[in-house]
Amino acid sequence: MPFAPLANDSFLRACRRQATDYTPLWLMRQAGRYLPEYQASRARAGSFMGLATSVDYATEVTLQPLERFPLDAAILFSDILTVPDAMGLGLSFAEGEGPRLAKVVRDEATVAALAVPDMARLRYVFDAVASIRRALNGRVPLIGFSGSPWTLACYMVEGRGSDDYRLVKGLMYSRPDLMHRILAINADTVAAYLNAQIDAGAQAVMVFDSWGGVLADGAFQAFSLAYTARVLAQLQRTGVDGSDVPRIVFTKGGAPWLQDMQSLDCQVLGLDWTANLASARALVGGAVGGPGKALQGNIDPHVLLAPPARIVQQVQQVLDSFGPPHTDRSTTGPTHIFNLGHGISQFTPPAHVAALVEAVHSYSRAQRQG
């Protein structure tokens, strides 16, 4: 059964560097713990994995922020660690401790055993993508996603989140051959995973390189960027409805390497809050009618802990920092998708998110009419 036509394509237009009536926005982790309705769904599901592996719950939770806020895109509710879980590493979430993998990949034997998994093990994700597309009924586009090869490797070597990345960096420097083997398998797995999401109905896909910024210059290019490029080279260009599927790459802490990332085969580069939007636009945003990258970001998520009046001020600063919006509908030009610089804090009052969304839409409309 074909999916409903899209009523709001502002996000996809901005990804393609096409003019929009306002700056579109969505928020990293927009479906999450800051929403009381998410907490209720999670309680019913019994656990995070109970939510993520249930088509019905994943659909319900993905749509929750859209019921509250007029966001311009939905993002699949899932977790980047479903991929190593499918590789047989055993994902679990202990209360208050974050994700853990039961098995780690740190030596020749465990690296030799690593292989691209059968995507049937992730069928629950692809079924959720199709279910969410149907439930959205054309309201806004659906973004699929994966962790980057490097970010997944961090968890696969460390076994959990890390403060210093001692184990994964130690392996990278002492046995780069093993690290490259892990990353090559991860890249081919991520590509297959994202292609299956596209086949299921994802209208854009995003690679989260959440830990790329912990790498040294040189190491970033060799161990993160090269393998993100390997993923992008394998991705399908069109979705189930025949439209192109924009590709987004977000590297937390990646501002120093924007010029390197300009060569990536993607339409959009995500920025964290340490990046200067004006500088990024000048470096990679391109000119009207010419090639370039759309930019996504990059307000500090903790701005949302401030009173609404302060949030409005900060929103305006971000929009002003990007500079004059592209308005010529006859050609492409520099475009901006508003987002946070990383995931939303669980302590964020939902009313503050409403203030941010309203401020982005109203101020960016005024910019175009001014």
From Swiss-Prot:
Catalyzes the decarboxylation of four acetate groups of uroporphyrinogen-III to yield coproporphyrinogen-III. Belongs to the uroporphyrinogen decarboxylase family. Pfam families: URO-D (PF01208). Substrate binds at residues 29-33, 79, 155, 210, 342. CDD domains: URO-D. Pathway: Porphyrin-containing compound metabolism; protoporphyrin-IX biosynthesis; coproporphyrinogen-III from 5-aminolevulinate: step 4/4. NCBIfam families: hemE. This is Uroporphyrinogen decarboxylase. It catalyses: uroporphyrinogen III + 4 H(+) = coproporphyrinogen III + 4 CO2. Its main location: cytoplasm. Homodimer. Disulfide bonds: none annotated. Its EC number is 4.1.1.37. GO terms for cellular component: cytosol. InterPro entries: UROD/MetE-like_sf (IPR038071), Uroporphyrinogen_deCO2ase_HemE (IPR006361), Uroporphyrinogen_deCOase (IPR000257). GO terms for molecular function: uroporphyrinogen decarboxylase activity. The record marks 79 as: Transition state stabilizer. Keywords: Cytoplasm, Decarboxylase, Lyase, Porphyrin biosynthesis. It is an enzyme of class 4 (lyase). GO terms for biological process: protoporphyrinogen IX biosynthetic process from glutamate. It is found in: Cytoplasm. SUPFAM superfamilies: UROD/MetE-like (SSF51726).
